Amino acid sequence: MRWILFILFCLLGAPAHAVSIPGVTTTTTTDSTTEPAPEPDIEQKKAAYGALADVLDNDTSRKELIDQLRTVAATPPAEPVPKIVPPTLVEEQTVLQKVTEVSRHYGEALSARFGQLYRNITGSPHKPFNPQTFSNALTHFSMLAVLVFGFYWLIRLCALPLYRKMGQWARQKNRERSNWLQLPAMIIGAFIIDLLLLALTLFVGQVLSDNLNAGSRTIAFQQSLFLNAFALIEFFKAVLRLIFCPNVAELRPFTIQDESARYWSRRLSWLSSLIGYGLIVAVPIISNQVNVQIGALANVIIMLCMTVWALYLIFRNKKEITQHLLNFAEHSLAFFSLFIRAFALVWHWLASAYFIVLFFFSLFDPGNSLKFMMGATVRSLAIIGIAAFVSGMFSRWLAKTITLSPHTQRNYPELQKRLNGWLSAALKTARILTVCVAVMLLLSAWGLFDFWNWLQNGAGQKTVDILIRIALILFFSAVGWTVLASLIENRLASDIHGRPLPSARTRTLLTLFRNALAVIISTITIMIVLSEIGVNIAPLLAGAGALGLAISFGSQTLVKDIITGVFIQFENGMNTGDLVTIGPLTGTVERMSIRSVGVRQDTGAYHIIPWSSITTFANFVRGIGSVVANYDVDRHEDADKANQALKDAVAELMENEEIRGLIIGEPNFAGIVGLSNTAFTLRVSFTTLPLKQWTVRFALDSQVKKHFDLAGVRAPVQTYQVLPAPGATPAEPLPPGEPTL
């Protein structure tokens, strides 16, 4: 039975390797070095078929065969041994190697292009030249060209007075600062009229071409080439007239002298005519009438002449144009001045690169090079013009400010300044975004960057979405800060209804709260903006927590300063403008922060004292002031007379209305409060308004001196007693005299 099963598997396995079933993939792979089993012959197949029939005919053998087949089917296949394939090592190239490779690639392509051009010129067949056909085609072509140029020149000459009136009216209106938009509108209007005249000329040219082609498709094709070149070149010349405006100086958007404007307009027009009519008209006609390779050679000669001439014009006028650009930058806004100065340094290299790239493009792709370069140039000029106009609008708006009503300015002193600051920042940001978009559009115009594809893909959409969300975050943060700060400033200011100013304590607390609010809003805004950009702020928060813990251990004095300062403020210990004594220092509080207090002495010295170093302090502006005046009188004087003189001085002082308004209540006479060997002391005390005790004391001293002199009350003087030595002869006593000071 087993040999029958073996033969059966051989018969079933042999065709299985030779037949491929569509849609079914095999998972078992065999080594390529294993040789396939030999194909059984016909006799072996017949014997196997007969044996299989005998097996199936017997119930016992058939059952045994079925069991063996199920056993084989249930046996899992052996897992294939994985092959270890070493990874492919890719050697990274340096920047120098990449530049060398790119240079070699384009150098070989350029060399092959010149070689192919040489082989085509020397080995290609030439078409026979038919003078009669050429003369006929040239006649019809020249007639169309003369009529089209003549018609276009005539209608532009008729429109010249209109241009001049538009320019004069716009310049007159532009003298008024509020009518600055009229001049740009007239410049754009003149450009649109120029394009309409060009469209009219093309329509007339097409009508003339239909009647001047002599029924020849070749002549019609050549005339269509001329009309296409005429449309493209004259459109470029219209752009040149928009920039230089050689015939109507009033419509010239830039400060350029008439001679320079005519010089550059004329030469750039000649250059564009050489390129356009040479590549679009002359080269195709030569290729059609003579030979394609001769047309390619003509293309190379035309572009080489154009490139050499353009480079000559660029470097011949380099210094003059650079100086004009620098002078123009001096009279421009600061934002535009930066770009103009940068452009003045590199304009000749950019212009040279432009014509060199055009030359090489014409070699590699003669049919589309001029179309691409002209299209990219026009788009670039349009992008730069629109970007300059939009940026100029933003710059003019920057010069303007928002002016609030006097009532609003009185209630919210900093609101106008803050609104103008936000508006200025928003306009500057919009101006920078305008420049960035203009740069990307310029790169897209030259095929270096696909701006619209980038904008539609994930990266561009994500960038725009992030910018919009950041703008909204900054907008709401600015609005929130402006509202809260304005409310605080409104509380700090008085209104037209005579609302009194808040106390010094309230002003100090509100100022500290405003500063803390600014820090909190700024921190939250920065964190949210970083999160929107894509920065994971979780490590920043964790790092800030760890850093804060580390700082807390190393900056206990700072924490003590803050806590002590907060409690002193809540207890209304001192405020800005108070006269205080802190330790050995006495002065006026000029500044209070969350960490320290600034005190200025009467000598002008300014001291910064940390809150934590203050253990006790005295405030002279709390409730009342006090004057305790002690006056020493010679003990030989009559006490009643001296006391009466002091009362007379106080009575005269109280009659002074200015001084009387500073005194609270009545003076207190204490009489004699001290007695010494040479004097006795009289005392009088006053209760005054805060910080007015020195004014009262100075006035009192003046009155006391006056009344003591009138009453003959003497101040105490120091006396000496001379005693003779023991055994000495006593001297004659001196006559008594007045004591001397």
Curated annotation (Swiss-Prot):
Briefly state the protein's biological role: Mechanosensitive channel that protects cells against hypoosmotic stress when highly overexpressed.
Residue span of the signal peptide, if any? Answer: 1-18
Q: Which GO terms describe its cellular component?
A: plasma membrane
Induction (free text): Induced by NaCl and RpoS.
Enumerate the GO terms in the molecular function aspect.
Answer: mechanosensitive monoatomic ion channel activity
Q: Which InterPro entries match?
A: LSM_dom_sf (IPR010920), MS_channel_1st (IPR049142), MS_channel_C (IPR049278), MscS_beta-dom_sf (IPR023408), MscS_channel_2nd (IPR006685), MscS_channel_C_sf (IPR011066), MscS_channel_TM-2 (IPR011014), YbiO_bact (IPR045276)
Tell me where in or outside the cell this protein is found. Answer: Cell inner membrane
Instruction: Supply one GO BP term.
Output: cellular response to osmotic stress
Record-annotated disulphide pairs: none
* Coarse class of the protein's main subcellular location: membrane
Q: Which UniProt keywords apply?
A: Cell inner membrane, Cell membrane, Ion channel, Ion transport, Membrane, Signal, Transmembrane, Transmembrane helix, Transport
Q: Which residues cross the membrane?
A: 143-163, 185-205, 225-245, 268-288, 294-314, 343-363, 372-392, 432-452, 466-486, 509-529, 533-553
Return the similarity comment.
Answer: Belongs to the MscS (TC 1.A.23) family.
Name of this protein = Moderate conductance mechanosensitive channel YbiO
Q: Where is the composition biased (Low complexity)?
A: 25-34
Cite a single Pfam family from the UniProt record. MS_channel_1st
**Quaternary assembly:** Homoheptamer.
Superkingdom is Bacteria
Q: How does it sit in the membrane?
A: Multi-pass membrane protein
Ranges for region Disordered: 22-42
